Structure formats: structure tokens, C-alpha cells
Amino acid sequence: MTADHNRALHDAPTARGGEVRQPDGDYFNALQTEVNDKGFLVTSTEDLFQWARTGSLWWMTFGLACCAVEMIHVNMPRYDMERFGAAPRASPRQSDVMIVAGTLCNKMAPALRKVYDQMSDPKYVISMGSCANGGGYYHYSYSVVRGCDRIVPVDIYVPGCPPTAEALLYGVMQLQRKIRRSGTIER
């Protein structure tokens, strides 16, 4: 695992004293304080767009191998990713998040780039699994791209072989945090 993967694993919320640490607790506490003081919120249009964007991620699957099965699990009733504001779409023109899951071969790399270019701005990429992150088990094969970040810019790396549905869900929540704190409409 690389340093990015270790960082992703250690940024997870942990239990301290029987209480689960909320990753965005300070953000929501500040909003609650402002609403309690004034009874309303004053914000900029840009902040409103950022807030709306975090709750309406439309993602498309680019399932290339066995990690795609875990993407299916995340949409089933047990996890139901739509509760977190992420809904699947079939067309790249309708989606703003691409989840690349599985081994990316040299022949498939131009197709991945073409689909990425068809997405509307702002667009985000989640790299799911060891094969998409760095080639994985097939790293030394002549036909494997050693990480989809060589073809498209990646925002979130989800480690594992295959990563669990919980790990992908955590990656989506990390992407929502990243969008919320980016501070600009354009990426």
C-alpha cells in the first residue's frame, strides 16, 4: 500500500470514550450555532452550490473486474448509497463522479479517457481497488496500466482487493467532504 492508502485508512472516524468522532462535526456545529443565534443562515451562492453538490453526486460505474461486484453491493438495501446523496447513472453526460473499479488494460485506457472527457464539469474520479490504484496483482503484466491515475486525475483512492462496500461508501463520503471544503465552483 502507498502513503495515500495509509492516509485514507487512518483518516477514518474512530471511537474515543464510547463516542464516534464525526468527520465534519465542526462544520455542522458552526451552522447549528448560527441558526440558533439568528434563526436563519447567511451564505454565498458559491457555498450553496457546494452544499448542493455534496448531496447530489451522480456516479457512473466503470466496472472492469471483480471490484464491480462490490459496487453492486453498495446499491443494495443493506448499504443503499442513495441515502447519502449518490445515485447511479448510465450516461457519462449525466454523471459527475466516475468510479473506476478493476484492472485497467492498455486497450481499455483510451475508452476510459473518452468517457471521462464526456462527463460535464466539475467531474470527480474514485479509484476503487488495488488494480485500479496501482495495477494490483497484475502490476507487472505487459498489458496493464499501473494505476488509472496515469490516464485520468483521481480524487479518492479506495484500497483493498476487493474493497468492501463499506470502504467504497466511506470513499464517497470522503469525496463529499473534499467537495465541501474545496471552496470554488470549478475544480
Swiss-Prot record:
One of its GO terms (biological process) is electron transport coupled proton transport. NDH-1 is composed of 14 different subunits. Subunits NuoB, C, D, E, F, and G constitute the peripheral sector of the complex. Its cofactor is [4Fe-4S] cluster. GO terms for cellular component: plasma membrane; respiratory chain complex I. Belongs to the complex I 20 kDa subunit family. It catalyses: a quinone + NADH + 5 H(+)(in) = a quinol + NAD(+) + 4 H(+)(out). It comes from the Bacteria. Binds 1 [4Fe-4S] cluster. NDH-1 shuttles electrons from NADH, via FMN and iron-sulfur (Fe-S) centers, to quinones in the respiratory chain. Couples the redox reaction to proton translocation (for every two electrons transferred, four hydrogen ions are translocated across the cytoplasmic membrane), and thus conserves the redox energy in a proton gradient. The lineage of its organism: Bacteria, Pseudomonadati, Pseudomonadota, Alphaproteobacteria, Sphingomonadales. Residues 1-10 have a biased composition (Basic and acidic residues). Its main location: membrane. It is an enzyme of class 7 (translocase). It comes from Erythrobacter litoralis (strain HTCC2594). Keywords: 4Fe-4S, Cell inner membrane, Cell membrane, Iron, Iron-sulfur, Membrane, Metal-binding, NAD, Quinone, Translocase, Transport, Ubiquinone. Pfam families: Oxidored_q6. The keyword Iron applies. The keyword Phosphoprotein does not apply. Gene3D superfamilies: 3.40.50.12280. Disulfide bonds: none annotated. It is a peripheral membrane protein. This is NADH-quinone oxidoreductase subunit B. Residues 1-22 are annotated as: Disordered. SUPFAM superfamilies: HydA/Nqo6-like.
